[in-house]
């Protein structure tokens, strides 16, 4: 009996995740030098789409920034109780950084802009763009509380 109840609960959670994903769209994203405010890269591609690995060509001078500001603009047709992201940065398949971001409550049928600051590793720990380009994948896990809604991957190229 408990197994049936667990399966029913898992099914409801899966339906909730599918509903959130179906109603979620990443409208645009940009990366800025946090010190100057200058936009270094922007995209209108929906990089939250989990069906494929995305590609982003970013300028190599992004690696010289001490702090990067990331803005994402997204729309959700459904309520999200505790929207949050977990990001893992992989270099040739090995995790080199992890970040955690909490947005909180998302109103149904709303469009939101979310800004995060990301501090660079010390210069002595930075790899050159030639080593990183094409070898870095940023994996983003989208959650509502503890419910995993989607996972997307973006391969970075430093031009």
UniProtKB/Swiss-Prot annotation:
Q: Name one GO cellular component term.
A: cytoplasm
GO BP terms: namely: sensory perception of light stimulus
Q: Which InterPro entries match?
A: Ig_E-set (IPR014756), PDED_dom (IPR008015), PDED_dom_sf (IPR037036), Rhodop-sen_GMP-Pdiesterase_dsu (IPR017287)
Under SUPFAM superfamilies, the record lists:
E set domains
The family this protein is said to belong to: Belongs to the PDE6D/unc-119 family.
Protein's UniProt name: Phosphodiesterase delta-like protein
User: What organism is listed for this UniProt entry?
Assistant: Caenorhabditis elegans
- Biological classification of the source: Eukaryota, Metazoa, Ecdysozoa, Nematoda, Chromadorea
């Amino acid at each position: 009996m408990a197994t049936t109840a667990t399966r029913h609960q898992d099914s409801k959670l899966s339906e909730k995740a599918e509903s959130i994903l179906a109603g979620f769209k990443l409208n645009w994203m940009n990366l800025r030098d946090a010190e100057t405010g200058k936009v270094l890269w922007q995209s209108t591609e929906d990089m939250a789409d989990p069906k494929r690995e995305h590609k982003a060509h970013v300028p190599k001078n992004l690696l010289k920034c001490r702090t990067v500001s990331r803005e994402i603009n997204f729309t959700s047709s459904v309520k999200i109780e505790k929207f949050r992201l977990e990001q893992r940065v992989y270099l040739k398949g090995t995790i080199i950084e992890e970040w955690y971001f909490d947005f909180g409550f998302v109103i149904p049928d709303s469009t939101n802009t979310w800004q995060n600051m990301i501090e660079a590793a010390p210069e002595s720990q930075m790899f050159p763009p030639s080593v990183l380009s094409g070898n870095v994948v940023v994996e983003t896990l989208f959650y509502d509380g503890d419910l995993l809604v989607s996972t997307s991957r973006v391969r970075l190229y430093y031009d």
